[in-house]
Amino acid sequence: MEEWDLLNENRELTGKTHIRGEKLAPGELHLVIHVCIFNEKGQLLIQKRQKDKEGWPNYWDLSAAGSALKGETSQQAAEREVQEELGIMIDLSGTRAKFSYHFEEGFDDYWFITKDVQLSDLTLQKEEVADARFVTKEELEALRSSGEFIPYFFLNQLFNLKNATTIHF
């Protein structure tokens, strides 16, 4: 049973929690994270979701993703999801999420890191992750164009966002 903290529109804890799978009431919001891991060559680590996964089964996705559990910060959730799904440890101390997207049911923080990871270092979570690989910007675009990658609206800017230090290019 997965339990989430509920937030208000200002991203403040409400003191209430929610059980995953139950319908959120209007105005109830929760925190989701995505992690984008780039290697030293500038390639993005992506994962293929299991064929029986709820929501986007058998699609390629970003490095790791999930909901923050009760009591977790965005950083803690990001570190935990990477460890659970990919079997590697990351330390996001001293960093901030690259950006946060506000969606109908909450807030989605996107973390970007560069880490020298080898595919042989990964231990994939069998229940959620079918495969993992590194891709270039061009390979990611090909997966998006073929309908094999979850169609995030910002996908064509992902590699630009990786190096961005301001809101301007």
From Swiss-Prot:
Residues 28-157 form the Nudix hydrolase domain. Pfam families: NUDIX. Signal peptide: none annotated. Mg(2+) binds at E81, E85. InterPro entries: NUDIX_hydrolase-like_dom_sf, NUDIX_hydrolase_CS, NUDIX_hydrolase_dom. Keywords: Hydrolase, Magnesium, Metal-binding. It comes from the Bacteria. Its cofactor is Mg(2+). SUPFAM superfamilies: Nudix (SSF55811). The keyword Hydrolase applies. A motif (Nudix box) lies at residues 65-87. PANTHER family: ISOPENTENYL-DIPHOSPHATE DELTA-ISOMERASE. Belongs to the Nudix hydrolase family. This is Uncharacterized Nudix hydrolase lmo0368.
